Amino acid sequence: MYSIAWRYDYSVANLAKANGLSDLSVLQEGQILNLDLSKVKKQQSSKRSIGTADSKKAAKTSANTDSKTQANVWLKKVKTRDLKWREPVKGKIVESFNPKKLRKGIVFQSAEGSSVRPVAKGVVVYAGDGLRDYGKLVIIKHSDYLLSAYGHNRKLLVREGQLVDSGQVISKLGSSGRLYFEIRKDGKPVNPLLYLN
């Protein structure tokens, strides 16, 4: 569900509520979601319909019940002001946030194989390559309304449902050495530099 909400700049909570699901629900293959199209931005670059591919990715969660329970307990207790934010990778920012130019995040230039770490503690809600233009992507939920995304990875080292700390390596960068990084608040992209120390 997170990958679908991410693709359409839609709040996971609102998408889940509109469909009578909890925001951590796992979708089943072929399950149909009700999208209020008047509130959903259409993407010109994606002609794929929602359904089979995203549902298969969402249904393939390898996290065990204990780690999911631990993650859910942590999410219920976390306060955003208590999160300690850090940069996700050592490198230079080469593309800045600019929503007018459809730049929803920032790009760090580092080196191939560099370690990527979460900007703050959170729960992995998506780990895969089912979203166009992001390559191998990790999305982490930090609170009820804050998500961060890490794209263009060569190798993912975490699984959906896993609780991760800010110092933990979650992925390795691909051949370009670039990390696409985004933060969303209530489903909408915000300038990541407002959060990073």
Where are these regions (language model features)?
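Extracytoplasmic low-complexity/disordered linkers and repeat tracts associated with LysM-containing
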Residues: 1-169, 175-180, 185-189, 193-195
